[in-house]
């Protein structure tokens, strides 16, 4: 998954860096999303279509998180829960199938990238948005919603955790010896 993201980012920077000023390449703006270079947006699935497909395949707990202010590779992140490995693969297949059907007869077909097809976390990358399909245990473990909500909130929990790391905790004295009293 990270290799796909890394390759997409590097190819975007190489292919679209001439469109932007050099100091705006890494700026997180909606204009520099992965869909910025696509001229015919009608061929790509829209967010309501993806939500309908996820509802049709009975994906549980579908969450849409707007990420255009936080990252440049996607405008939205969609997180859905599948009940089994088969259900996760079915979610991915339904999304890819619908993208193929919508682009039938087009000169250039743009298919989404699918990563982790035989795992408990499948990522389908459409360019404008990224769909994460996880099973219940993986979704609870990775807790992707809190990553994006913590990033969007004003409080930074990483600084608070860093401050707590440097607090020295003295171990409790469990020896039978009484501590020596220092007289002054």
UniProtKB/Swiss-Prot annotation:
It is found in: Mitochondrion. The keyword ATP-binding does not apply. Its main location: mitochondrion. May be a ribosome silencing factor involved in organelle biogenesis and required for germination. Gene3D superfamilies: Beta Polymerase, domain 2. Belongs to the Iojap/RsfS family. Residues 1-39 form a transit peptide. Keywords: Mitochondrion, Transit peptide. This is Protein Iojap-related, mitochondrial. One of its GO terms (cellular component) is mitochondrion. InterPro entries: Iojap/RsfS/C7orf30 (IPR004394), NT_sf (IPR043519). It comes from the Eukaryota.
């Amino acid at each position: 998954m990270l290799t796909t993201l890394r390759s997409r980012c590097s190819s975007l920077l190489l292919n679209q860096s001439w469109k932007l000023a050099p100091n705006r390449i890494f700026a997180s703006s909606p204009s520099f999303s992965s869909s910025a270079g696509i001229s015919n947006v009608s061929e790509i699935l829209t967010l309501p279509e993806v939500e309908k497909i996820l509802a049709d395949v009975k994906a549980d707990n579908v969450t849409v998180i707007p990420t255009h202010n936080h990252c440049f590779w996607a405008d939205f992140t969609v997180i859905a829960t599948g009940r089994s490995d088969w259900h996760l693969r079915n979610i991915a297949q339904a999304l890819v199938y619908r993208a193929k059907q919508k682009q039938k007869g087009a000169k250039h077909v743009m298919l989404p990238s699918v990563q982790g097809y035989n795992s408990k976390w499948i990522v389908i990358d459409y360019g404008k948005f990224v769909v994460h399909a996880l099973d219940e245990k993986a979704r609870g473990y990775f807790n992707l919603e809190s990553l994006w909500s913590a990033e969007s909130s004003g409080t930074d929990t990483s600084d608070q955790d860093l401050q707590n790391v440097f607090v020295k905790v003295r171990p409790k004295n469990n020896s039978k010896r009484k501590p020596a009293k220092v007289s002054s």
